[in-house]
């Protein structure tokens, strides 16, 4: 839920932010919005290759979520073109690695041979709730504060909560596997 909320928040927030705050044209904002999309597509595939090397799902997911928080945290400094472009690429990398990890998570939790459709129900339920919540959170924070940067900081906090949840999940998985 929290990851998808920030994902949808990003892709609904970014074009409006670019037009309202950075004075881009609507067409320019759409073109810039494609940078993280292209990076995301590439890193979704790379994420699968990384998982096949034996890197654990929780490790990759924690890394991806940390990158995502970093991408959000760079937004207030994105007036500098290098930082702005870097934030788009960093966020795109994270947004590609994260869903790859999430789709691999059910087989990690219940075992690959038992990860049927019901194992994905939780992932999909969280995803769809996040699709609904992300744009509402972004709009709500902007309406409350009148400041788009507050939206970025809100999603840094959401990313932090997601990282904490992922680390807790990793600890629980390790404990279950060791019999504790």
Predicted feature descriptions by range:
Residues 2-8, 36, 40, 52, ...:
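Hydrophobic transmembrane alpha-helices of secondary-active solute transporters
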Residues 110-147, 155:
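A late C-terminal transmembrane helix in Major Facilitator Superfamily
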Residues 57-102:
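C-terminal transmembrane helical hairpin of 12-TM major facilitator-type secondary transporters
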Residues 25-33, 84, 116, 120:
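Juxtamembrane helix-start elements in MFS-like secondary transporters
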Residues 16, 100-111:
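Intracellular helix-loop hinge segments at the cytoplasmic ends of transmembrane helices
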Residues 43-56, 142-143:
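Helix-to-loop junctions at the C-terminal end of transmembrane segments
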Residues 1-37, 41-44:
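Extracytoplasmic gate region of multi-pass secondary transporters
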